[in-house]
Every structure is written in structure tokens, then in C-alpha cells.
Amino acid sequence: MESQSPIESIVFTDSCHPSQQENKFVQLISDQKIAIVPKFTLECGDILYDVPVAFKTWGTLNKEGNNCLLLCHALSGSADAGDWWGPLLGPGRAFDPSHFFIVCLNSLGSPYGSASPVTWNAETHSVYGPEFPLATIRDDVNIHKLILQRLGVKQIAMAVGGSMGGMLVLEWAFDKEFVRSIVPISTSLRHSAWCISWSEAQRQSIYSDPKFNDGYYGIDDQPVSGLGAARMSALLTYRSKCSFERRFARTVPDASRHPYPDRLPTPLTPSNAHWVVHNEGNRNRRERPCRSNGSSPTSESALNSPASSVSSLPSLGASQTTDSSSLNQSSLLRRPANTYFSAQSYLRYQAKKFVSRFDANCYISITKKLDTHDITRGRGSDSPKEVMKDLSLPVLVLGIESDGLFTFDEQVEIAKSFPNATLEKIISAEGHDGFLLEFTQVNSHIQKFQKEHLIDIMSQTNSFERLDSQVNDTNRESVFGEMEDITSW
């Protein structure tokens, strides 16, 4: 009997596969499948065995196997494109399952089902943790192609992705026979020094958390302070100054909707009060202040001093009531200015939400993956235009002028490097995240492009399962994307 080819030996299973036995994050994605690739060699030379790759599909593959629409997710995304790009998915929309067989595959290093630091290493009988090898953008493309071929795909009609997903899309373009058209959004031909520096700053936040322990931590006791700080830093690069000023300015949170988080003990002395203000927002603070010499601002002598009449929490932004009889006039005059604002509240909320759905080692793994991205690497020239001169497939490049992470100039460079590219602008003041928020514009640009270059696919109608009603709900909050009003958190 003839041995199976690598493609034929790939099997499909679900999230209960042994590779996920310690991975709590995989349960966040419903109805996804997991492909198991028996053997896969990474660019770094390491060989992985029984490699899980998570994916979701919508629609039906046609008999020619050429109506595949591939969606590539961003850094913290998952295979559940219905969560982060739901308003674009459905009949009559850009990602129409009545025309396309839509596939979204999870990247290596992500905590959502594909091989990563949180998946099981059969050789060590533990999760990979910090020993998970470096996986590149090209590794993602190579292993994803195996899954698509196993699904019966003969050609990708269109590959679409933003940010990190756009990097995968650009790499897919080099598979000229397999890929018919691409739509890279808010991405780059090579990861810039600016982006590399932001990734480094975020990783250093994680490294500096004492709980990180070189990456050897329990999945239920990860370095949340460091990971949360990294997420805050990243969020600032995903938005714009204009976006934050317009939404927050110097407003303070509504205490009835956003109670003051992690309220500190009521200060009993001026020193204690200063300590409260100074450590507000410090997730690793002590319960009570303790000086380096072992003394405490709340010592008995301090409590008996005249200044101990300062007995209420200094203003931290939310309105508070104070018993005027407990404070003398000079204390009231010295009452400090607000130190807790809506912008801070939003960042802390997002950090808290993120650390409940992501893993620190995975964050490090994926940001290092981004750093490897360079479309010219190993292709004989440092000139993108030179290495891409023979890539004649239709290309739609979408960019955002307010994007400070993947600048509009970089989108212009992408469009100029392809022989057959069109550049369109997404009008948004939201910065980089505009590609996950401006659904109407993104949908319109992609549909116009499809009608021009995929008319044969668009004229076909295939059967498909009814979509979850929540997929197209623009008012629901996304787990992996940006579908939320950032002033209604």
C-alpha cells in the first residue's frame, strides 16, 4: 500500500485534542476545527510534530476548488473572523459565503489553538512555554497552505488581511499560481524600526514583571502586570492622539458606571495620603506603605500628630464627599488636583480584559514573528519593487492617513512595488485600528475590487449554513477585535 502524502496525512479534530490539554484560551473560540499536521519544518530549522492549526470556515468550496477567500488575522486575533470582522461577513457583503468558501486560519504562536507556547509538547510532557521556537510569517503561510490543500482548495481567489494579517497576505502573493488576488490593509513590506521598537518596549514590560520568571509561569498565574502594561502601550499605537482627545480629553470617569478600581485604604496621615496618590494604578503595590527602613507612615506617633486630621482619600477624579469638620481650612486649600482620568480608566479596562484572554509568552512569540517580516529577505535584492516585479496579480492596498504604526506612506510603497496595484484610502481619525472599525468603507472598497477582478466567482451562488445572528451585529463587543464604542466601556 502506497504511503500517504503529507497533505493526505493531515487530520481534522476539535479543541479537545491532547495538544490543547493545558490551553484555557482555546475555549474562547466556538465551533472551530483543529488540523493536525504530522510533521512541519520551521524556517529556523526546528521540526515540529503533530502540529495543531486552528481554523474556521464559512460557505462551500465549489467543484473547481477556486472560490476560496482567505482571511488573515492581526496580532491578537483568532480564526473567528466573525468576531473581529463580522459586519463584513454575510450575504451581500464583501465576505459573502454564498459566493466564497471563506477560511480563516490561526497563526503559529497564538494562544487560540495553533501550535504555540500554551500548546502541549509531547517530548517534554508539558506546554512549550518559552521553549517554543521562533515561527515567522512565512512559516504561517507554508503551514496554512497545507491545510487549505487538505480542504481541497486549488486556488485562493482572494487573500485579505490587516496589520500582521497583511504581512501574510503579502507573502501569499509570491505563490503566483495558487493566489489570484490580494488585499493587504494597513501593513508594510518590512517591519519598520519604529514598529520593532514598540514591540521591544512591550516585551520589556513583560520581562520586568517578577512573575514572568524567564517564561516559566503557571497558565493561571501569568505576569498580568507586565502583559497589561504591554497591552496599554500597544493600544496607544493602534489609535491616534486625535481619537483619544475627542473621546476623553481630561474628563473623569462616571463613578456610578466605573467605580474607582482597586480602591486603596483610606489614608490616615499626610504621608499616607501622598503614598496613596503616588501608587494609584500600581498593580503590584503593598496593602500598606512600608519604608525602606521598615517604618510605616501609619505608625502610632504619626497617628497622634496634629496632621492626622487628613482623613479622606485625595481626589482621584471621581466625585467624593468629605466631612469638612475632619479637615482644617489649610488642608482643604492643599487638596490635590485630579489624578485619575477617563483615558487611564479605559486603558486599565482594556488591559484587564486582555490579560484574561491572552498569554504573555504568546505575546512575545508573535511580536518576535512580526520583527522577522521583510518581503525582500532572502530574495536576491533589497528592493521590494525588484523582488515583486513579476507579481502581476491584481492587488488592492488599503491604508489610513491617521495610522501612526503602519503609515500611509508605507501603503503607497506597497502599491508602487506591485505592477498591478490600486491604492485606496480609509477615511478615519481612529489610527491603525480604523481597519477594524470602518466597516462600511472597507466593505465598499473590497466589493468594488471583487466586481472588477472576480466576476466569475461573484456570478456563482453556492449553498451555505445560516450565520449566527450575532456575527453581523455592529453593536456587540468583540473579544478579539475593536467592535465597541470606546466611551461606553
Curated annotation (Swiss-Prot):
Keywords: Acyltransferase, Amino-acid biosynthesis, Cytoplasm, Methionine biosynthesis, Transferase. The active site is at residues 163, 403, 432. Pfam families: Abhydrolase_1 (PF00561). It comes from the Eukaryota. GO terms for cellular component: cytosol. One of its GO terms (molecular function) is homoserine O-acetyltransferase activity. The keyword Acyltransferase applies. It is found in: Cytoplasm. Its EC number is 2.3.1.31. Residues 255-329 are annotated as: Disordered. Changing residue 163 to A: Loss of activity. Pathway: Amino-acid biosynthesis; L-methionine biosynthesis via de novo pathway; O-acetyl-L-homoserine from L-homoserine: step 1/1. GO terms for biological process: 'de novo' L-methionine biosynthetic process; L-methionine biosynthetic process; methionine biosynthetic process. The keyword Cytoplasm applies. Belongs to the AB hydrolase superfamily. MetX family. Commits homoserine to the methionine biosynthesis pathway by catalyzing its O-acetylation. This is Homoserine O-acetyltransferase. The gene is met6.
